[in-house]
Amino acid sequence: MPNDLTPPALLVEGLTKSYGPRRALDNVSLTVGRGEFVALLGPNGAGKSTLFQLLSGLFGADAGRIVVAGHDLKANPTAALARFGIVFQQATLDLELTVQANLLFHAGLHGMPSALARARAAEMLEQFNLSARAKEPARALSGGTRRRLELARALMHEPTILLMDEATVGLDPASRLELLRIVREMREKRGVAVLWATHLCEEVAEADRVIVLHQGHVMKDCTPDDLITDTGKATLMEAFVSLTTERASVPA
């Protein structure tokens, strides 16, 4: 169990990133505790995808630091990235490989011994109700089932924190709710922390905390209930809109 001396699953301090004259992230700081479910809520263009690209090491930040379970991403990228399980907005499965082979390929990238990889794959297939489809190509799966496979793959190496980057985009309402339910269940069963990026208020109501991102700035970091109370609004949607309209002032 985490204690006061255990470093958080994720620590972001002063993260800044610009593309030419446009500043996509401006001095962003946030923390995700061990086993915590934190929703990153922001409209399109808020900087959510840029943040996830920096977290996953696809690009470097102009300033600031990222520490994953005590490992500085810049100083020790291998150890830091190994603590992440990531489901990107765009599907990243190899559609020609079988369901099982997608899991085993991921295990190989993380240096898992063959016997352990096969045991973990069998466990994930069972847990995500994919055992009967293990030998089918990923191409044969529906959108919702592909997302389940991507989540199973992200958990293969037992990460400290899951990064879910708009993972429900393109899913029907039933599949979207099912994916959210599974992620919450994995958090409860495995103690994995979650950073869930979304623009949909209905996906954040049960989060431990909500971080509202707008124009590259953190506008609010609090519980869903406090977000409503602090803005003086009646619903999460109204609170979100009040913080992310063009009239909303970003922090100086």
Regions found by a protein language model. Give the residues of each.
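Catalytic Walker B motif of ABC-type/P-loop ATPase nucleotide-binding domains
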Residues: 162-165
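Helical segment within the ABC ATPase nucleotide-binding domain
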Residues: 177-189
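Conserved ABC transporter NBD signature motif
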Residues: 64-75, 80
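Conserved catalytic motifs of ABC-family nucleotide-binding domains
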Residues: 158
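Conserved ABC ATPase signature
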Residues: 137-141
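Conserved ABC ATPase "signature" region
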Residues: 104, 108, 115-133
